[in-house]
Amino acid sequence: MQIPRSIGTHDGSFHADEVTACALLIIFDLVDENKIIRSRDPVVLSKCEYVCDVGGVYSIENKRFDHHQVSYDGSWSSAGMILHYLKEFGYMDCEEYHFLNNTLVHGVDEQDNGRFFSKEGFCSFSDIIKIYNPREEEETNSDADFSCALHFTIDFLCRLRKKFQYDRVCRGIVREAMETEDMCLYFDRPLAWQENFFFLGGEKHPAAFVCFPSCDQWILRGIPPNLDRRMEVRVPFPENWAGLLGKELSKVSGIPGAVFCHKGLFLSVWTNRESCQRALRLTLQDRGII
């Protein structure tokens, strides 16, 4: 007889794929954390409602999600399998599926299946989860370490989902600005504009800047050509503004209320909106656009 709301996965060393798979099922309220069973015993696993990363079977109908068997020739690990399951059974829409896949799960799949290896100086999500495993000489409970890694992953996934939901709320505001503004998009608060701008066809939009208040100051930020070149801008600030602060920037630009201009010429900060607008106008004149 199966144990409802239970999930079985292998014992011993754990990896990001089964930890992520378990976390996803917990977040979507399909399993209980206290019903995670770590074993390789087929009899024990047969009693679990879900089984992931062990058992040699991939069957979405039977809630079995292993990718190690020869009969499976796909690209997913157990994390990708569970994410796909959640989409197929209507627990998330396609947009959220692609967001979670592109921001986290695809990378977990790639590293678990040996198609990606971290470089020195870079630490992936899978590398972080690996660190939670106890060292051989440590007399610790692997289940307790698994639980620590699981809680970290649950928190991370919850924050990703909140970001996704927030981005969707911001999209309508960005769309309205794109429909009413041309060279500069004005917002009344900081928001997730960049991804939404390009999601809404921003590569073909004429806007070169965004302007919004932040921490009692005003930000004038250049828009990149596309997301792949996000550290570049369509229209840079004047060269002689690079790296200047406060009075020095005000003196060179002739604009009062200056705070800072990034040396990369993609961001400037001002004390008020009017100074931002003057900086915008001067920059467009400097670049021969108006």
Curated annotation (Swiss-Prot):
Top-level division of the source organism's lineage: Bacteria
Signal sequence segment: none
Name of one Pfam family that matches: MYG1_exonuc
Family that this chain belongs to: Belongs to the MYG1 family.
Protein name: MYG1 protein CPn_0489/CP_0265/CPj0489/CpB0509
Organism of provenance: Chlamydia pneumoniae
